Amino acid sequence: MYEPVREGEPVRFSLASPEPLPAGLLVHTRHVFGSACGEVAERSPAVPGLQTLSLFGVAGSDASALERLRDELRGPALALGVDCALTRGKMAERGPRLIVSDVDSTFIRGEAIDMLADAAGSGPRVAAITEAAMNGELDFAEALAERVATLEGLSVDRVESIADSIEPVPGADTLVATAHARGCAVGLVSGGFIEVIGGLARRLGVDCVLANRLETSGGALTGRTEGEIVTRERKAEALRRWSEGGRLPGADLPGGSDSPEGSNLPKDPDSPLEARGREGADARSRGFPSPRERIDLSETVAAGDGANDLSMMEIAGLSVAVCAKPAVLAAADAAVTRPRLDILAAILGWDAV
């Protein structure tokens, strides 16, 4: 939950766009930020293909200016199609230490459930349910069960083929690499399926994944899931537990002997999906907290696009709406309005790796 910037608090405001930053917006941004922070350090984060500006300062004593700061900076930028973020405290100084992102239409192109449904012949029906669930019009768990039921009989081989075709949104690899270079961990939370996203998470070096697991029998999907469903509450729980260096039952954590009992993998060791799911747990952590280490929630970022992401966004230090539904955009602290995640690195004030 956003609270006004406090006197003496480090503050950063960053802009990013693939188009030239409007001159009038730059004048406005420098004036508003300077009025609230006095002396300002200015730089342009180096992210290929983006025009950027990042202002850093220490909040002054004008309480009225600080109260209005976020809205006076954010509103004009978004109105002009420029993505932006206001960060504060330690995050303003060095960036976050943990980024947790939704997956479907945020970290990957499209919705995995819709891809599976197209293959199963239930695409239009499932797409309509997905849209309603994303808008918060349906109970997520019930909507998921209804959609997964339409996948009954879809072969494991077809699921593997779809998983192989999954692509991250542009810049996702840059965001992960840049975060790791800064000592920041990256986790994924998804109402989708570990069998679909596990391999991609491993290839990109994602530190931890929480997703649903598909039940299989005889080389095909049964139309059911296994284990506890990933709801908006479980997404928030994952962010909180991971920030504490804790273990979340049902999550794929950094692999090897450290993987917890009950990790989110298919239970059949002979299933072809077992290896694919296991890949998601094999990613080696570069910045993930140990059980003895704690990351304050003020140093976390939650990124998402739908109603199912709002609970984790509410508790994160910075909530980022990524190509989001209007209600999510209105609730978020920051926005990425284009399908490329290197913009998130830029508005955190980071140079891309």
List the model feature ranges, each with a label:
Residues 252, 258, 264, 268-270, ...:
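Intrinsic-disorder-associated, low-complexity terminal segments enriched in Asp/Asn/His/Tyr and depleted
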Residues 1-101:
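Non-catalytic pre-domain segments flanking phosphatase-related domains
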Residues 1-2, 8, 153, 158-250, ...:
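C-terminal cap/substrate-recognition subdomain and adjoining C-terminal extension
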Residues 97-111, 308, 313:
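Asp-based phosphoryl-transfer active-site loop
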Residues 45-56, 90-94, 104-214:
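Alpha-helical substrate-recognition element adjacent to the catalytic core
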Residues 23, 63, 67, 107-110, ...:
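Electropositive phosphate-/nucleotide-binding environments in soluble metabolic enzymes
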Residues 261-263, 267, 275, 289, ...:
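Low-complexity, intrinsically disordered segments with a bias for serine/threonine
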